[in-house]
């Protein structure tokens, strides 16, 4: 079949002095960072949905892109053409992974049986493409939010028949992900929330989604899927309030249903800021709670209150993110998926490459600077010194439950405690970070 991106052979590393816009300037896959290849640290993935499914429409305008696979015609044939172009893109971009929703890669059809038949065909097509290209599946998921049946949610829907349809989609998408060697399976509750409490039973819906997640875990173990299950937090949009609001909320939900050892989180930068947090905060929180899994790398617009899904371009922001990830030992099954799309006015097909190349260079620089921070160790030393008192006999007795509130009160009185505030040195630390970044 004719190449779609026929003016490009493959994006390669050419160094920071290159002026070629279709080359990497900082991302060198084989460069060794802290004893590991850069590619193995970053584990880049391109997403199917924004890159090959979005037609450029927004709330005020129709599709703006002229994609051959988005024209009228046989849906299954167009899906196969889209797969051809997608894997050409993955290969030429030199990304090791990709991600998809079920209906990104396969036509939904007019019935449940058509959905199942189409997805089975396209799973075989994807398997062939993976084998031929060497590109692997980072994670799969099911779209249980776009179809009108999911207007009131999927797992939280008041109709158990809708719940059952969603269960069928997740069951099928999990099986496809396992068949394709996917390293994770993601659950995003796009409409698992409410518009108004006037028609919502919060306890009922929480019990429903809790049971749904338990069934997902049960199916994982029954089938022997070795990947990681991930929930992707988001506070709102499309619903007014969503139950997977942020990392801390997800952790509380997992604890309630006994799933905190079974499910981790896939953190998206733009979702973090919509929740009123920094991307750095959500990453650090997930690591502290032991549920860090994977990342959707993108950014929002601080002047806009919705999910703009722009490509990441802040080295400063992402250096702190990569610093946390490196300190925690790096990714295991997760990676950096670019859940990002070109702007509606970016109608040149090579804009898809420009967006991803810039994002990959951004994350590569962030990795390099984070590695410098790790190697230097000054930030960790300052933090360790700040909390050193908790390694003392008093601190350890408190943490180990060897002192009651009454005993602590007696200790403070007997030792005439008069602790003095010690500086947090925030400005000093910020200056140190800037020196890592800018010299």
Curated annotation (Swiss-Prot):
Enzyme superclass (EC): isomerase
Gene Ontology, cellular component aspect: cytoplasm
SUPFAM superfamilies (alphabetical): Xylose isomerase-like
Primary localisation category: cytoplasm
Cofactor comment: Binds 2 magnesium ions per subunit.
Subcellular location: Cytoplasm
Signal peptide from the UniProt entry: none
Chain residues that bind Mg(2+) 1: 232, 268, 296, 339
GO biological process, one term: D-xylose catabolic process
Binding site for Mg(2+) 2: 268, 271, 307, 309
Keywords in alphabetical order: Carbohydrate metabolism, Cytoplasm, Isomerase, Magnesium, Metal-binding, Xylose metabolism
PROSITE patterns (UniProt xref): XYLOSE_ISOMERASE
Cofactor(s) the protein requires to work: Mg(2+)
Family affiliation: Belongs to the xylose isomerase family.
Subunit-level organization: Homotetramer.
Protein name: Xylose isomerase
Gene name of the record: xylA
């Amino acid at each position: 079949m004719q190449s779609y991106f026929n003016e490009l052979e493959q994006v390669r590393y050419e160094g920071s002095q290159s002026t070629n816009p279709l080359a990497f300037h900082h991302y060198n896959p084989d460069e060794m960072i802290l004893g590991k290849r850069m590619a193995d640290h970053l584990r880049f993935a391109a997403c199917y949905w924004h890159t090959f499914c979005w037609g450029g429409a927004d709330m005020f305008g129709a599709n703006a892109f002229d994609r051959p696979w988005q024209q009228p015609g046989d849906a299954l044939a167009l899906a196969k053409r889209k797969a051809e172009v997608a894997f050409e893109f993955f290969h030429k971009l030199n990304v090791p992974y990709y991600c998809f929703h079920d209906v990104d890669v396969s036509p939904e059809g007019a019935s449940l049986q058509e959905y199942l038949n189409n997805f089975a065909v396209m799973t075989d097509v994807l398997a062939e493409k993976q084998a031929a290209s060497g590109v692997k599946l980072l994670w799969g998921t099911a779209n249980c939010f776009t179809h009108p049946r999911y207007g009131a949610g999927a797992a939280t829907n008041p109709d158990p028949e809708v719940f059952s349809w969603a269960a069928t989609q997740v069951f099928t998408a999990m099986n496809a992900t396992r068949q394709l060697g996917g390293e994770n399976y993601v659950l995003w509750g796009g409409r698992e929330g409410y518009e108004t409490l006037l028609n919502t039973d919060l306890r009922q819906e929480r019990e429903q989604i809790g049971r749904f997640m338990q069934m997902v875990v049960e199916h994982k173990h029954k089938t022997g899927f070795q990947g990681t299950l991930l929930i992707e937090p988001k506070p709102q949009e499309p619903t007014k309030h969503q139950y997977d609001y942020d990392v801390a909320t997800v952790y509380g939900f997992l604890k309630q249903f006994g799933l905190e050892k079974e499910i981790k989180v896939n953190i998206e930068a733009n979702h973090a800021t919509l929740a009123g947090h920094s991307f750095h905060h959500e990453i650090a929180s997930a690591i502290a709670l032991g549920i860090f899994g994977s990342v959707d790398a993108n950014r929002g617009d601080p002047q806009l209150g919705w999910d703009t899904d722009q490509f990441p371009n802040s080295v400063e922001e992402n250096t702190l993110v990569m610093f946390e990830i490196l300190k925690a030992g790096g990714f295991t099954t997760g990676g950096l998926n670019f859940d990002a799309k070109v702007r509606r006015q970016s109608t040149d097909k090579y804009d898809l490459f420009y967006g991803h190349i810039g994002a990959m260079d951004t994350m590569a620089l962030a990795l390099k600077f984070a590695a410098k921070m790790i190697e230097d160790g000054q930030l960790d030393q300052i933090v360790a010194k700040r909390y050193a008192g908790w390694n003392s006999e008093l601190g350890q007795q408190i943490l180990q439950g060897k002192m009651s509130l009454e005993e602590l009160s007696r200790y403070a009185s007997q030792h005439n405690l008069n602790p003095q505030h010690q500086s947090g040195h925030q400005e000093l630390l910020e200056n140190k970070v800037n020196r890592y970044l800018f010299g």
